[in-house]
Regions:
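A short aromatic-anchored loop/beta-hairpin motif
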Residues: 1-144, 148-207
Length: 207
């Protein structure tokens, strides 16, 4: 399904890494990633977060102090299993910074709408007052350490080169219970010529 640009912006769009990203001559930072674009302008560039790189056990590489720092005092370090499911590596830029996505616009003021049922940022103080959101059975919150960024015209050049496949964003993939398969899920839902790519093995030699 092609993406229709609104006001010449890719905000709210998924960038699905094409197999071009697996070429030897390209840095492999974004191999099999899905990036949600949070900001985009032809004049200033783009900012997004990788939605399918959960920290998992790697969350242990971040000290309790560091986690508290990036969450501005929200103590999420008591339950490592829980934290490992909601913390993601958002990208290679400013990995000591925090971006968070949620569906809590009713309780978090100043949230920025990304699309109809997904919001970014807002006042973390309000989140502290609603600890129950961390215990919700349904995923409604994700934290991303770092982000992906492109200078003016850079992303457009990568798209033209075929490095990215554009897909309309949706919250189901952002909050997928199996983020490790989001790349495959995104391609499969695209259908047509993209669906077969979702079955392409990471190492064709061993297939």
């Amino acid at each position: 399904m092609p993406v229709q640009l609104k006001n010449d912006t890719l905000k709210g769009t998924f960038l699905i890494a094409s197999l071009n990203q697996e070429s030897d001559w390209i840095e492999h930072t974004f191999v099999r990633t899905v990036v949600l674009i949070l900001e985009h302008s032809s004049d200033t560039g783009a900012v997004g977060v990788i939605i399918n790189r959960p920290l998992g056990e790697k969350v242990k590489l971040y000290s309790s102090e560091a986690l508290r720092k990036v969450t501005e005092g929200i103590d999420l370090t008591g339950d490592t299993e829980k934290v490992s499911k909601i913390f993601f590596r958002g990208g290679p830029v400013k990995q000591d910074s925090l971006v968070f996505l949620h569906q809590l616009e009713d309780i978090i003021p100043d949230s920025v709408p990304i699309f109809h049922d997904l919001y970014a940022g807002g006042e973390l103080d309000a989140l502290r007052a609603h600890d129950t959101v961390m215990d919700s059975a349904e995923p409604i919150l994700r934290f991303y350490l770092g982000h992906a960024g492109w200078n003016e015209g850079q992303l457009e050049g990568e798209i033209e080169r075929g490095d990215w496949i554009l897909c309309p964003g949706n919250s189901n993939l952002v909050f997928s219970p199996t983020p490790e398969t989001v790349w495959q899920q995104a391609l499969y839902t695209m259908g047509d010529k993209y669906r077969p790519l979702s079955f392409f093995p990471e190492d064709p030699i061993v297939n």
